[in-house]
Amino acid sequence: IVAGAAKGLKSLDIKTAIDTIHRTHVTDRNGLLWKIKTIAQEVSAIAYQFDEFKTSKRKNQGFNKLTFLVNDTSEGKKMSAACKETSGLIQGIDLAKNLANRPANICTPTHLAEVSISLAESNDNLTTQVLEELDMEKLKMGALLSVSKGSREPAKFIIIKYAAENPSQAKPVVLVGKGVTFDSGGISLKGGAGMDEMKYDMGGAAAVLGSMLAVSIIRPEIDVIGVIPATENLPDGNASKPGDIVTSMSGQTIEILNTDAEGRMILCDALAYAEQFDPEAIIDIATLTGACVVALGEHATGLLSNDDNLSNDLLTSGTRSGDRAWRLPLWPEYHKQIESPFADMANVGGRAAGTITAACFLSKFTKNMAWAHLDIAGTAWKSGIQKGATGRPVPMLVDYIQSKALDRNCDED
């Protein structure tokens, strides 16, 4: 109903609309906040247009105001709070979309760092820090630097923090987003078909920045930290070669069998770095494997975790927000596929169970933390006539963060 109405309004170039659909009874989904979020997200998704680089803007710019009718003052207060929360979420989703849709010559690692700095300057509850390659060398981030060495664009390591107004003594939630702003595959070069879409390989980083913006507006009572390793993956005379062995920040050695498995290389150093925050939970988000697209298509994000409670919470948030995930196993048998005769591990484990073996690799850097991995290779963007970023999994992440804040408040009461 909502999608049909929104498409009709857009086609008629109507700028404002009044909603009464939120009064409709929905079985098992009758909460006001859920209805407002669902309606506003659907309308926003249809109204969204990415035309930053169009010299002639589209005539139909879509509507820009949605009004919800209320019965009384009490309902109005609830509606106002719901609208503010929903507005924050939509702004976060749109930021994630805009970042991912920008071309790789614009959205470089430096650009991601600049956006993070801008967010901190515009929001008093956000702070940011950007590490340069020299800093990464001092931290011995050999895995991340093995990817960036093939590009003339300097890598950036971004830390962005949200500080709650009245934080509890509980630990923060940490989000780690893969920020490969263009992925050619490196020396293990990808085929040319569809390579333009490899600008979307920073979808994890976009989701982290979008989530941090949303959180800064919604202001849940929980500290959140975003960590983004940002780089390009390109081939030149200095690029890593298949067979190279590097030492990660954790001290573990990695045999690089495929330079196109670079996402896990930059994430492993980011995960090792994030351990210093002693997080309650750490969630990495990455367009990591084509195998996940084969397994789950474009509808469900792949979820793998070493913690059942964290996994169940994310699955619940995915269902509640309409941004669903499906859990895959991390059984010991799969770990054997990434064994190396020359190093502590290999960065790939063959064609079979590619999504799982990639997560097995990451799990070796999260042994002391409750950790979840979200593989968004199938859900971060769409191809074809609807080509463009989706903003996922910002809705799931924001819902999870809000639910953890509410859980803590209940515990303290």
Language model segments and positions:
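A generic structural signal for tightly packed, nonpolar segments enriched in small/aliphatic residues
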Residues: 112-413
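Short amphipathic alpha-helical segment within the helicase RecA-like ATPase core
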Residues: 1-179
